[in-house]
Structures are given as C-alpha cells and as structure tokens.
Amino acid sequence: MIVSIRGAAGVILGALLLGSSAACISSYAAEIPASTSSDFALPNLLSAEDASRYRDIFTLEAQRKWRDADREIAALTDRLLMPEVEAQRYLSPNYRATYAELRDWLAKYADAPSASRIHALALKRRPKGEPEPPTAIVGTGTAAAASHDRPRSIGAADEAAYANGGQSQAWLAGLAAWRAGHMDAARKHFEAAAHAGASSWAISAAAFWAARAELRSGHPELFNYWLGIAAQNPRTFYGLLARRTLGVDSYIEFDPQGFGALEAQIMTGIPAGRRALALIQIGDTARAEAELRGLSLRGSNDVQRAIVALADRTNMASLSVEIAAHVAEDQDSHSDRAQYPVPRWKPRGGFHVDRALIYGLMRQESKFRPVAHNPSGASGLMQLMPGTARTMAAHTGVHGPVSDPAVNLTLAQQYVIELLNDDRVNGNLLYFAVAYNRGPNALAGVKNASKNGDPLLFIEGISNRETRLFIHQVMTNYWIYRLRLGQPTPDLDALAAGEWPIYTALDNSAEAPIRHAENR
C-alpha cells in the first residue's frame, strides 16, 4: 500500500518564495494502514509438553538447580534447544564446565549465538597437549553483537555526507550566500552540493535548498526540477518536504512483507531458524533475537528477507529495524513497515503524548533497545540522563531501572510533556527537538542565532551538527510514524509552507496535556 498524501503545491510555492506563509494549509489524512494480522500461524516446532519443560529448564538453571534441570532434560522428546540450555549452564559463574563439555558443545553447535563465548572459555580450560577446540562460525557471539549498532552507524555514515569534502563546502557556501541575500550565488552553490552529494540525506537537502534559491533568484522554471531531485529520496527530511510541496504521494509503503509458508520453509530448513522459532514458541524473544541476528550476518538474501518478516510479525522492534535497514542498503529493497515498527511497550498509565512522537524519538535514540547505553550516561529506550530520570521519577512517583521499558517510557513521556509545555518551547517541535537533544537551556543560544523567522534556516543555522541531524531524523521518524498510524501530518504541511511546526495531539488514546498557544 502506498500512503497517499497530497499537498497544496501552489500555496507552498508562494510560501517558499516569501520565506513564510500567510496562508493556512489544511491537513491531509493518510490512508489507514492494512491490518497487521496474518492468517498464517507461526509453526510450533515443539510439543506443548516440551515447550513447558524448556521453560522450566531455563528457570531451574537460572536458579542453579542443576539436578532438577537434568530431570526435566531427561524427559524431553525434542532436544532442539539444547544448545541454549547447555550454553546457559556452561557460561554460568556457578557451574564449572569441563574442557570436554565445551569442546563437544562447539563440535555440535558452532553456529549458536554463544559459540564465541564458549570458544573463549574452552581455550582457557584446554589442558596442555589437547588440540584447540572447534571455532565459532562467523556471525555468532561478539560479531553478531557488534552488528547490533549497525543501523545507527549506517545512518551516521549516510548523514555524514553533510560534512564531507566538496559537498560540505558548497553546502556551507550556499547557506552563507542565502543569509547574505545573494540568491544567485546561493542557488549555484546548492546545485553544486546536490551534484556532489554522496548520500540521500545530503542530496535531498541541497536540492531542496536549490529549489528555494531558484525562486528567490528569479528562476521559477527550475523550482520543480530541483524539488523533483529532492523528492527522489522520500525517507529523508527534505525528501518528505519536497514531496509534500509538489503534492505527490509520499511513497512510504506499509504493506507487511508477511511471514508465510515460504518464509516458514526457509526458517525451518536452517538449524538457527528452527531454534529461533522454538524460542519464540516458549516466549524467549531475547534468545530468539540473538539467533536471528547471527543468522542474518551469514544468511542469503532470501534468509534475510524471511528474518525481516519474522521480526515484524513477532514485534522484535530492535531486530526489525536493524535487519530491515541492512536489507534496504544491500538489496535496495525497503520494508518501511519493518523499519518503522510499532512496539508493544507502553508507559505506566498509558500514552499521554502521541505515539508517533514517542516512537520517532525512540527509534533515533535507542533503535528500540531497552538496554541501550551512551557513554554520556544516557540510558534506555529514550536515552534518559540520570539527572533527568531522577527528576521525572520525583514528578511521576514512578521508580525503577531505566532499562525497564515501562519505567523508561513513563519518565521520558513526562519529560516530553514538560518540554512541550515549557515557555521556551511552547509546543514548537523544532525547539522541542533541540531541548530534548541538548537540554532546554540550550534554546536561548540557538534562538538568538536565527531571528529571521525561517524555520529551515533556524535548523541549518544551529552550530552543533549532532543537533541538526537529530532534528532531521526525529522529524522524519515522526512524520513517517504519523503515516504508519494512519494520521494526518499538519506539522509537515506547516513546515513545507514556511511556518513553524506546532505539536497537535491526534491519538485518540493520548490525552496530552499540551497547551495549544501561538508560538512565541
């Protein structure tokens, strides 16, 4: 399904020419996405009895009740998950695994997620004169864990084109000429930046500004041409703005890839795929994700697409984003539904801020990883700093580890509400993004640096590159999640028209206590 969003191109064209809009652009409702349900049932590879026994075994081993666990193991009729069971035991600090146990495990299960750790332990336990144990297969253990950060690094590398070589010089020269009112020079610099751009984000940004400069410099016949260049990258900040300005479809696709008979056949034909399905059956999604993450690094294109479908189907949000981004890059095949998952986590007491904004922040901040931690000290799904978490805990009465999704979302939602209501923000989404990224005290400096009333120039005038890119990415996520949830995007209309985007609550489930005042 292509989500249809139409813009008022003539009105927006005038707004871009003048730098602000005197007209109000109405919101355009998106088509409601198709149902997420599927008639194809995930295969249950374990009998009900074995599924129950495996749950008990993992619990007993976590409690160091080895003999009780052994009795349950002896009663199993299917030993599919024994690699996980034995790895949990052998890696426990309360169990002394022998070299023979570790060597034999590696001989049978070198493709399992714990293989690298088991191999390292086996090397430590290897008696003199014994041959080295079998090695782990590439795509397990630390290699797979390292790939966990790949979506963030891909995005950073993509967007880093803003700061690379000739493209960066032309881009900065274009902005300087624009500020000085030298529009003919600005358009030439932006055109050069668009031609030199090495990423979709850089190309769409330069092309969009080239379109603006063409109007200002008296070349309206080139306006649509440069907007069309920007619009070729619909999953970027300026690409979405360009498509809204032109009044064309967003080209964001939310049809589920679907986990069906073919995907089931692919997954059940691979040991790691079978283990992942069995782990999903017993409710152990953490171990299932580890299996699928390792498999994705060594699997074929068909295997990777099957993993994307399974991750989307089973609500593995972090894995869904990670693998879908990898597939999009390597296979030029976008799965927008998988790249913009709707996780099941909720704040305590429910949502009081629209989910699109919360999900948009979460996708950028942690890629949906509850245990994400930044060297700066920020932690959890919404990357809360310790001081912020303590303050919001005092305001909400909710306490607990920020690695707990419900706790993190509850505290972060309160922080979002307080920022949006802050007199320095007053519902302005661009100011809000700055405040969330750098703290509300940073707003005074960035506001003073740009007083001409042009929201886009405000963004590009922010000296901190991380904050600029944060605004681009969070707003892009936010708009795409609006579409994912079947909602209009009035703030996209506003920004395309040269106006400041103001938060408007649209969720029926979000009784957001946000003031709706004029931006100051």
Predicted features along the sequence, with ranges:
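Bacterial N-terminal signal peptides
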Residues: 10-22
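Alpha-helical segment of the N-proximal tetratricopeptide repeat
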Residues: 52-65, 146, 168-182, 270-287, ...
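N-terminal leader/linker segments that initiate helical-solenoid repeat arrays
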Residues: 28-76, 80-85, 133-154, 165, ...
